[in-house]
Amino acid sequence: MDVDHEVKELVKFIKKLGTKGADGKYSVKYGVLFNDDDVANFFEALVGTLKAAKKRGIITFQGEILLQRVHDNVDVILLKDE
């Protein structure tokens, strides 16, 4: 599976699991994303996909990398619907 496909699937999961804010952007807590069974079954390396999506300007989150438990309450925000 290629990174572009994984990023597109990540966008779908953020929209499915997240909520749309007043600014029209979807966001989801990292812990919700990480602990979802469908997400866990789809992504071999969720952190790598998140980093790739952030580098492409599709999502944003505070910090460079997200770790389970430590960053469970960090918002992953969808910037572009691609």
From Swiss-Prot:
What task does this protein carry out? Modulates actin dynamics and cell motility.
Give disulfide pairs as residue numbers. Answer: none
What's one Pfam family here? Costars
Report the InterPro entries cross-referenced here: Costars (IPR044302), Costars_dom (IPR027817), Costars_sf (IPR038095)
Name of protein: Protein costars
Q: Which organism is it from?
A: Dictyostelium discoideum (Social amoeba)
Give the superkingdom in one word.
Eukaryota
- Which protein family is named in the record? Belongs to the costars family.
State which gene encodes it.
cosA
